[in-house]
């Protein structure tokens, strides 16, 4: 409730939990978009629209609007509480940009990296790798679970060039 989310993308595996959480909200409910995933069977749709349909319905003439202030929030992530109580972490545009540039330079990623997501995106906003990969026109390879067999299969199948890890 306190984050003020206006849109939420829902993985079908967690649709039940999200549906319950939405009933507990006191403020305005976010617009819910379902994300289909061929790697998961089950779950139910709780959203107003499916992700690919939402993208297809977009306005191709939409004019980009840069943030009014580089210190405005670009992302709000919630930790799982590994080292203490769960907490919300705000990333601002300036910080995401500077961190992404630092990742590019220090990581020597090159153009079009193929990145395997083993680092949770909620973990410091995935160390800002979502923005890093966007800047480099990289490929995101996602797993349903971080398991050794799935990781090696993804590496072979997609030609993974980079990944990060956290305990």
Regions found by a protein language model. Give the residues of each.
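Structural core segment of the AMP-binding/adenylate-forming
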Residues: 1-56
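Conserved S/T- and glycine-rich ATP-binding loop of Class I adenylate-forming
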Residues: 8, 73, 79-82, 115, ...
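Short hydrophobic/charged patches on amphipathic alpha-helices used for structural packing
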Residues: 1, 65, 149-152
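Conserved AMP-binding A3 loop
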Residues: 74-99
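Adenylate-forming
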Residues: 8-20, 37-38, 119, 144-149, ...
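Structural detector for helix-capping/boundary residues
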Residues: 6, 12, 49-53, 71, ...
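Conserved pre-ATP/AMP-binding loop-to-beta segment of ANL
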Residues: 34, 48, 56-78, 85, ...
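Conserved AMP-binding/adenylation subdomain of ANL enzymes
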Residues: 97-114, 122-162
């Amino acid at each position: 409730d306190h984050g003020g989310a206006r849109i939420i993308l829902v993985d079908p595996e967690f649709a039940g939990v999200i549906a319950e959480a939405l009933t507990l909200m006191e403020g305005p409910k976010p617009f819910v978009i379902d994300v289909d995933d061929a790697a998961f069977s089950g779950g139910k749709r709780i959203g107003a629209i499916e992700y690919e349909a939402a993208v297809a319905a977009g306005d191709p003439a939409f004019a980009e609007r840069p943030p009014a202030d580089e210190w405005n929030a670009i992302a709000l992530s919630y930790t799982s509480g590994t080292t203490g109580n769960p907490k919300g972490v705000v990333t601002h545009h300036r910080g995401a940009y500077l961190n992404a540039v630092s990742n590019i330079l220090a990581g020597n990623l090159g153009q079009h990296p193929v990145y395997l997501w083993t680092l949770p995106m909620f973990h410091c906003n995935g160390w800002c790798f979502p923005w890093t990969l966007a800047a480099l026109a990289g490929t995101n390879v996602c797993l349903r679970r971080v398991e050794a067999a799935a990781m090696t299969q993804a590496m072979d199948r997609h030609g993974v060039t980079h990944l990060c890890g956290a305990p």
